[in-house]
């Protein structure tokens, strides 16, 4: 969606029909990583620290092999733009910076994305969409 020339995105995994237990575990792991990433972000934090926690948490819950990329990228005139959060990102998060928290996990059979726009605030983030941060299974 674009508003006044600015772009954003919202991503949610949706299953048509019931998920297998393995699928549901991976989708839940993605949601957990996604929400924790937003918890770790606030003004004054070095970007690479968010990335470090993201990958450490992926190791802890056993999904590091399923991470395609992550955890965040800039948001502005294009949906995906600088700055990216990477393990070597030396910049500090500053108030009013905008990021897409973009959690992408995959396995042999499927992939999933959780994505929310955020604004960096002094004590955390303001999410641009908090709707449907839950596992969605539609009848098939």
Label for each model-derived stretch:
Residues 1-140:
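Active-site neighborhoods and metal-handling regions in enzymes and metal-associated proteins
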